Amino acid sequence: MSFTDFQTYIHALESAGELHRTDVEIDPNLELTEVSIRALREGKPALLVERPKGSQYPLVINHFSSSYRTELAFGRHPDDIGHELIHFLERAMPPTLQFLLNNKPTIKRFLNARPKTVSTGISQQIVESPNLDALPIQFCWPLDGGRFITYGQIFTYDPRDGKRNIGTYRMHVFDKETTGMHWQIQKGGGFHYFQAQKLGQDFELAVALGTSPALTFATIAALPEGIDEAMFAGFLQNKRVEFLKGKSISLSVPANAEFILEGVVPATERRMEGPFGDHFGHYSAASEFPVFHLKAITHRKHPIYPAIVVGKPPMEDKFLGDATQQMLAPLAKLIHKEITDLWAYYEAGFHNLLVVAIEQRYQKEAMKAALGLMGTDQLSLTKCIVTVSSGVNVRDFDAVLKEIRENYDPHYDFVMIPKVPLDTLDFTSYKMNLGSKMIIDATKKPQRRSSDEQGNNDLRQRDTGDLRSFLRGIDRRITDINIIDNALLLVKIDAPIQYYTSSPEIISALKPNAGKEILKKLLQLPELSHLTLIAIVSEDVDIHNQENYIWGVFTRFDCERDVLFSEQKLIGISPVYNGVMGIDATWKPGYQEPLTMPESIIKKVDEKWGKIWKK
């Protein structure tokens, strides 16, 4: 079944037993976040809150927070969509009559990719003056800078040629008529705004709240720059996306949204935006961003406000991100024929860890592919790429560690790239939008024996308790360890966590932190020389839970500052690494605080929990 508007999908969820309605009042100020997180952890259905505190409009949350719900949204598994796309495109050049006859359903989908202009639509059934206070906008985390619209789909048009872009960006509500516009680097809307600034023009745009599932997924998909997300949505839902002229702006807006916010972003105005509890599991710091001025709100009759909460994984964005990469990952083969699969780990916030399977046809082709991906659209924001041989399950972190253990030699297979663009949300380099990246090539090399063949498996036979006692004798700050497949030693330490050091100058003047001190000791121990990786983490990371330790390691280090080897030197201007690779993934002075919910809010939700889910 195709869904061309939001409420049709919501009703389908309810019919399938995947949505629960509650008339219990829930406060969008913090309470909704706790309810959303707890419901996801307990496997509850999506929740339609009929009486959000302070608003007449109902809201829905967790409507994509399971694999079943994403399949329901498209009528099939996202993997199947990706396979259909790549199968069609690989055989379409040159097209033959037999090809066209055999692929009529897919051709119809491509014809339906063309957006359509209509004269009326449900999104303009009601026209109102600007008043964001009427909407049940969330205050997600206790240290957030204010209320944030979290599911806004921003429709922008290039002022030079009119090409459309749709992206999902958070919007910090300053008052009833203005918000921040959090355009991170490498985002299409930000590129359009850049062109408007060059022309000295104020920049009109529209924000849709609550669209069809296909348009929602297309909006967050990492499509190549210049590809219209509305066309991809039309392909996904097999029906053309409809647009109509805005009421207060000259642009086209979606015809079938729950709400449309119309307005303008001045070319030169900036305002402090944030902090905001983001999907890396920490607060992103306040910084200056453009300002959106609301001119009009239109909506359908009896609209439902869409809400989402992001934070420490797993959250609802796990299912959104996984579904979009399942659909789009096969397309990487069109550009890089050597790539057979790739997977970005939601546990690491997606951009911090990408694993790529390579069919290597010549030496170092895997490294070539990794460097190419680091220069490709939104994949250019990836911090760590691990390459493995074709056939390895890139979605299985244990399988990836096995390949690293057997095939990775840092002398030949490690590349660190300093001083390059980095995800805006990454705080580990202390410089917004700048940092470092690294590549680990763990593909099989026919000319080398694997570490297992060389007999480097001593630690498999060693009792973890004995090793823990031995390492605590080296440094009493070590509280726990976990050895994973003889490849990765996770070490938890008890050391003070300092947040919000005031300036980079103070940070650089501080002595090395405990994590780096302990890491240097461990890297020199002969007893650990057969390991491949050592990672030091802080007390808040559960090193026996894979989801948690992937998050705790990959969101908390800068490659240039925090990666060490047991042997490293310069030969000419070339860095040479050997031995065990160490990562200091502890919290460091200047890092932002991790996301936690106050006990008072947890207790409030405890009191309501049974009533919320009462049938």
Protein language model annotation of sequence segments:
Residues 1-276, 281-615:
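Extended, highly charged
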